[in-house]
């Protein structure tokens, strides 16, 4: 069996500067748990042979294991990370690490640095879930193209409605937009004088039939889809 002995009972094993939890009058006591001393049953001294057997077993794992090293912190023992050169010796295929600034990324850990001052020619680095710079370009011409293509959609929708083709509701397209697009199209493409007179005759004929209670006869114009 092994015992925890006080420094007063075995003065030859421990220096006098290390204090224990046992009293000065007792021969056996509880030593400080931070510094245990293993004593052989015969009282011949500490078992240094077992400690020597444990040390090669720990070294057999190589330098990849973290080695506890006493630091200046008050918390106790801290763990030392493996060195880069030793890691590269066991893993030569891994490329060397480069700083984030060389890749065009801002370091999120450095809050004391100056803000990024980028011009229009240099895109601002993105910090969104691993997206690289330039993945989400914001173009100022997108709004202009969308506004320019909306009258074309209105005219196409009107033409399909006149031709009797079933249309699909366009999101964001209102009835006022259709009316404005039809008016702009009629102003940009005026009809010839004969066609205007025919339209006026049809309207007058329709009003006359409606006044007499008869159904008007619709005459199709040349070149129309009806």
From Swiss-Prot:
Primary localization: membrane
Tissue specificity as recorded in UniProt: Expressed strongly in testis, weakly in epididymis and not detected in other tissues.
Top-rank lineage group of the source organism: Eukaryota
Transmembrane regions listed in the UniProt entry: 153-173
Assigned GO CC terms: membrane
Signal peptide extent: none
Pfam families: SPATA25 (PF15218)
UniProt subcellular location: Membrane
GO terms, biological process: cell differentiation; spermatogenesis
Membrane topology: Single-pass membrane protein
Keywords: Differentiation, Membrane, Spermatogenesis, Transmembrane, Transmembrane helix
InterPro entries: SPATA25
Family of this protein: Belongs to the SPATA25 family.
Function: May play a role in spermatogenesis.
Name by which UniProt lists this protein: Spermatogenesis-associated protein 25
Organism expressing this protein natively: Mus musculus (Mouse)
Taxonomic classification: Eukaryota, Metazoa, Chordata, Craniata, Vertebrata
